[in-house]
A protein has these predicted regions:
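RNA-contacting regions in translation and RNA-metabolism proteins
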Residues: 1-166
Length: 166
């Protein structure tokens, strides 16, 4: 029987970079790992799960001796930065309060959101939550990705779709 391999773990270091870049002693490693998870969960909850969806597809964390550098890859960076940079300062202060470390936040715009798998999946799930036709919605996102320049698209959707009974 074939064994399933995590695609992220399989590609990390070869075609993908790490999501967190830091080194720690044995005593600090677990604390840093939990801190990274808290930061990612907070950013995801604030910018992807609430009504103001900024489309944060990736959160990179780099730790140096003095500070934690967080890079957010977003489809709509204006939602994160806010007017005159006010929102990003609030985010930085909240993360500093949560972690107790000096934090710098950088926001990078995703040039083609139609080519980002995470953003496509989030948008598709949102449409399915609104009870849209799953075949039409999947076809629409496939065509949008191909029009944006993708070489190929494969979308898999499972569950009890279209009100299918057991």
């Amino acid at each position: 029987m074939g064994q399933k391999t995590s695609p992220t773990g399989f590609r990390t270091g070869i075609t993908l970079g790490w999501q967190s870049t830091w080194f720690a002693s044995k005593a600090d490693y677990g604390n840093f790992l939990i801190e990274d998870q808290k930061i990612r969960a907070y950013v995801d909850k604030k910018y992807n799960r609430q009504m103001t969806k900024a489309g944060v597809a990736k959160t990179e964390i780099v730790r140096t001796r003095n500070e934690v550098k967080i890079t957010l890859h977003s489809a709509r960076p204006g939602m994160i930065i806010g007017p005159r940079g006010g929102e990003i300062d609030i985010l930085r202060e909240e993360l500093e309060k949560m972690t107790g470390r000096k934090i710098s936040v950088n926001v990078i715009e995703i040039k083609e959101p139609d080519l980002n798998a995470f953003l496509i999946a989030e948008a598709l799930a949102e449409q399915l939550g609104k009870r849209a036709s799953f075949r039409r919605t999947m076809k629409l996102y496939c065509e949008a990705a191909m029009a944006a320049g993708a070489k190929g698209v494969k979308i898999m959707c499972g569950g009890r779709l279209a009100g299918a009974e057991i």
